[in-house]
Amino acid sequence: MWSGPPQPDQGLPPPLAAVPVPWKSTDPCQGHRESPGALVETSAGEEAQGQEGPAAAQLDVLRLRSSSMEIREKGSEFLKEELHRAQKELKLKDEECERLSKVREQLEQELEELTASLFEEAHKMVREANMKQAASEKQLKEARGKIDMLQAEVTALKTLVITSTPASPNRELHPQLLSPTKAGPRKGHSRHKSTSSTLCPAVCPAAGHTLTPDREGKEVDTILFAEFQAWRESPTLDKTCPFLERVYREDVGPCLDFTMQELSVLVRAAVEDNTLTIEPVASQTLPTVKVAEVDCSSTNTCALSGLTRTCRHRIRLGDSKSHYYISPSSRARITAVCNFFTYIRYIQQGLVRQDAEPMFWEIMRLRKEMSLAKLGFFPQEA
């Protein structure tokens, strides 16, 4: 609805009333003129119609602009809300991803720690099992060694009890000590030597050496007895102590000093280590061992002396599979030294329960056997 004349700044044309219109006849055939009132009404209607058209157009434009602005504002608000909601969701997702990442890192760390702990525990268990196995094997080996040693000592003790006789034995109770001319033939079965292998401390009975007259005088050597008592206070197998050093120099060394020096050194070391074995000769084929150009596999040649003798025994050093045939004389010398070492080992281990003087005389008897064997005296074998 039009409310008044338009303002000059709106660019609308001036009203028709302000424009002078000349009087002119529009129809030459018309013989009269219109009245001024009718003309004024017609001009006013046209003017009103001309003014309402641009105002309506401007109003429509304004309305369109207002609607467009409203649509833009609503679209902008909607987009802002969508952006805000998307940012919020993205933030939540980022937080969730960060939380899940922390959980994953924690799980990975726990898994790594658990794996390391399992490996460490497994390694510890394996190490403990290996240590227990090694300890068990060591104990088993020691137990077997002790069993072997005890068996050898029992055998040696039996032999020592059998072969040890008093200085003046009762020949009526022991007819085997009589000479063959006085003893006469004996009925029944006689003892024969065992054919099984025997360790060196348990071989060669020494009864043939210990025959002494009924009235044998004895006197203790004070120097030897003092050295023995000093050794007895702290028994040892160290050859540097005065007591054993004298025995080595006077008895053991000369008794084991054979022609074949190389083999003599090995035999002496085996006797000291208690690893020498003496066995009776068997009929099976044996490996040949050469020592200083002497055929040690022959039963007619002694590997230690190099002399041609009937060899009824052979020796083996330690765990070696090689054997050396020895003559009766060489065997007697070796067994005499073995008997001495066996007895001093018993003293060292506390197995001999005697006073100092009886122990001293037993050692002197064993030294006497070594001296006799070195000089070539040995019992004849049946």
UniProtKB/Swiss-Prot annotation:
Record's compositionally biased regions (Basic residues): 184-194
Region of interest (Disordered), ranges: 1-60, 166-198
Assigned GO CC terms: cytosol
Transmembrane portions of the chain: none
Compositional bias ranges of the Low complexity kind: 45-58
SUPFAM superfamilies: Sec2 N-terminal region
General function of this protein: Guanine nucleotide exchange factor (GEF) which may activate RAB3A, a GTPase that regulates synaptic vesicle exocytosis. Promotes the exchange of GDP to GTP, converting inactive GDP-bound Rab proteins into their active GTP-bound form. May also activate RAB8A and RAB8B.
Annotated family: Belongs to the SEC2 family.
Full protein name: Guanine nucleotide exchange factor for Rab-3A
Organism per entry: Homo sapiens (Human)
